[in-house]
Structure formats: structure tokens, C-alpha cells
């Protein structure tokens, strides 16, 4: 059964979600709402079948673990327009709809001679999801280049434009993550420079550029280097179900870092997000506990990267969650460090 407003939105009952999450776990949405025109949101949300129901927004399902059927309604945005809305001498403002593929936007920006997003190449997901997690990789995070987030405020039932301060961005955090039931992101505007200082001092980017023979590297070269590295390290979700890095790198006070280094001298430590803080490598902690490449049934940790929780075939979301909890518990027991998941866990508590 389905209901629709022609070309604007569509409501589908009892929709399977296996194809809408990159772990490829089975789950069913009581209602699936496809939004083709964001301005139709108020009308669509007032549909009697879903009015007042909980909402789960799914982009490509690359940052979620469905440990059970989501309650209420699952919402997907299908607006995939990209527009350069302002040109300036040294930068441009690019607007992308929530349904735009993230990597597609990165490559589009590079083709337009714009930089800034190159270190974030090949991150799975959609533009609408990127501010929620404040996606980051290889020394960059998307909040550095967000100009405005356009959203529908379910509390006031109004469309709003939020600047970066109002988005309350932090490490893998934002107001959208802190208040998941309030805002529905419909588009994002990016402030992208024509030229900016390239971030090369992270995770082998310089070495990869050297292998590529890119002596005078530009933003497009950095993007290709990142793509090469990610393709070597991270399994393709179409081949092996996963959501990329499953665990956050722990941020700890400097005093706790020093105490850990006194006991584990080879423990790698990176600068934190704030003074008096350091960042540990969750991958290192997990590998030291012997989990890299380990599996129980079809739930496991990738052989190539210890941060990546994988579904080898038919693991359920609940089985993947239980396995991830075992990993986190072993790290806590050995290092007294608490690991937290990057993806949002639906249908169960972490």
C-alpha cells in the first residue's frame, strides 16, 4: 500500500530496508517516506499514517546499524541537485540537496576548480548526512567548509538556515546528532576556496602522492591519493557489508594519556580537539586486543582495518551489535578506555 503527492513525496507501507543500509542487514520500515521536493515536507509529515510518529532519516544507510526494526517512519530524501549559487574572487558557495551522493559532490567540486573537500573523498553517504556526524578523514572535517545547513525544524514547523555556530559542530558531533528528532536536513551550502593549504601530513598521503608521481600535488591529486588509500584499507560495502569506521578514536585528558603511555610505551597518540586533550587510535587498541580479522558467525572485524565491523553474509544487526560490544569490552578491560560507535544504533542501546 502506498500514498503519494505526485512528484513530491511517496509513502510506502512495510518497506524492506536491506538495500538501504550498507551493513546489508534485514529490517523493515512500517512506513517509508520518499521526499522528492523538500518543500513538501510539511504536507507529507501531516499524512495521517505517520503524523506524530518517530522519524529515522536514511541517506545511503552508511552511518547506521539497524539492530532491529526502526519505530515509526523511515524518511529518504531524493533531491539530488547541485548548484553554484555564488562566485567570488577566491571562493564559491555550492549548494547541494540532501540526497546528493557525498563522493559525487567531492568530485564535482574538484571538476569546478574548487578545493577543500579532497581529503573527504570516497566517504560513503549523502550530503544530508554529512553535517550530522561532522564527517572527517585524513586531517579534515566537513564543518571547516560548511556555510549554511538548510533544515526543517520539526519543533517550530518552519524551514531554517543554520550557520556553523548554530550547528554546534564537534568531533563527530553536531546539534543534529544531539537533537536527532528536531531537524531534518534538506540541503547544505559549502564555502569552497579556489586554493587552500593542502592537508598532506596524515595517514600516508605524502607517500601515496610519491607513488603516484605527483610532485607538485593539487587538490585533485590529494583526492586520488585518499581514494587509493581508502580502497586498499576499507572493504567495498557492495561486496562486504560495513559502515566504514565503526568506532570513534577516543579523546582523553592529557593526564590519562600520560598514565597509559607509562604502561604502554608504544601506544600512538595524536593531538586532541582541545588543549589538554589527546586522541588515541581505536584501531590500534582493537588490534592489540587481537580482534583484527576475527569473526563469530558472519559478524567480524575486517582483516584489512581493525576499525571496520563487517557482515560476512547473513549476520543480523543484533549479532553485529553484540560482536561490537565484545570488542569494546575487551578494550575497556585492558586499557580502561571506553570505545563509542560512530554509526547510530537503531533498535537497541549501545
From Swiss-Prot:
Q: What class of enzyme is it?
A: oxidoreductase
Single GO cellular component annotation?
A: cytosol
* EC number assigned by the record: 1.3.1.98
The protein's location, in the record's own words, is: Cytoplasm
The catalytic residues are 172, 245 (proton donor), 342
Quote the InterPro entries the UniProt record gives.
FAD-bd_PCMH, FAD-bd_PCMH-like_sf, FAD-bd_PCMH_sub1, FAD-bd_PCMH_sub2, MurB, MurB_C, MurB_C_sf, Oxid_FAD_bind_N
All copies of the FAD-binding PCMH-type domain together span 24-195
Write out the pathway annotation from the protein's UniProt entry: Cell wall biogenesis; peptidoglycan biosynthesis
Tell me what this protein is called: UDP-N-acetylenolpyruvoylglucosamine reductase
Amino acid at each position: 500500500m502506498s500514498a503519494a503527492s505526485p512528484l513530491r513525496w511517496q509513502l510506502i507501507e512495510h518497506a524492506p530496508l536491506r538495500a538501504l543500509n550498507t551493513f546489508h542487514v534485514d529490517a523493515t520500515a512500517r512506513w517509508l517516506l520518499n521526499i522528492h521536493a523538500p518543500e513538501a515536507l510539511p504536507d507529507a509529515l501531516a499524512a495521517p499514517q505517520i503524523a506524530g510518529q518517530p522519524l529515522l532519516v536514511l541517506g545511503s544507510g552508511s552511518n547506521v546499524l539497524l539492530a532491529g526494526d526502526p519505530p515509526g517512519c523511515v524518511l529518504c530524501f531524493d533531491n539530488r541537485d547541485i548548484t553554484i549559487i555564488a562566485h567570488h574572487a577566491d571562493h564559491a558557495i555550492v549548494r547541494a540537496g540532501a540526497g546528493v551522493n557525498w563522493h559525487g559532490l567531492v568530485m564535482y567540486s574538484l571538476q569546478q576548480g574548487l578545493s577543500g573537500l579532497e581529503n573527504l573523498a570516497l566517504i560513503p553517504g549523502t550530503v544530508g548526512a554529512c553535517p550530522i556526524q561532522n564527517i572527517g578523514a585524513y586531517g579534515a572535517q566537513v564543518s571547516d567548509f560548511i556555510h549554511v545547513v538548510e533544515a526543517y525544524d520539526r519543533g517550530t514547523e518552519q524551514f531554517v538556515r543554520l550557520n556553523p555556530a548554530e550547528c554546534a559542530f564537534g568531533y563527530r558531533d553536531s546539534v543534529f546528532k544531539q537533537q536527532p528528532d528536531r531537524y531534518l536536513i534538506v540541503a547544505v551550502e559549502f564555502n569552497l576556496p579556489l586554493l587552500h593549504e593542502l592537508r598532506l601530513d596524515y595517514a600516508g598521503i605524502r607517500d601515496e602522492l610519491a607513488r603516484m608521481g605527483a610532485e607538485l600535488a593539487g587538490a585533485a591529486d590529494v583526492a586520488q591519493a585518499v581514494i587509493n588509500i581508502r580502497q586498499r584499507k576499507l572493504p567495498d560495502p557492495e561486496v562486504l557489508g560495513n559502515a566504514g569506521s565503526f568506532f570513534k578514536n577516543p579523546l582523553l585528558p592529557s593526564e590519562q594519556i600520560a598514565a597509559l603511555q607509562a604502561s604502554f610505551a608504544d601506544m600512538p597518540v595524536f593531538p586532541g580537539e582541545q588543549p589538554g586533550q589527546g586522541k588515541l587510535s581505536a584501531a590500534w587498541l582493537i588490534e592489540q586486543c587481537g580482534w583484527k580479522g576475527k569473526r563469530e558467525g558472519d559478524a567480524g572485524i575486517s582483516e584489512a582495518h581493525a576499525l571496520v565491523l563487517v557482515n560476512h553474509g547473513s549476520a543480523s544487526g543484533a549479532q553485529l551489535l553484540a560482536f561490537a560490544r565484545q570488542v569494546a569490552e575487551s578494550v575497556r578491560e585492558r586499557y580502561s578506555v571506553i570505545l563509542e560507535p560512530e554509526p547510530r544504533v537503531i533498535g537497541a542501546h549501545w
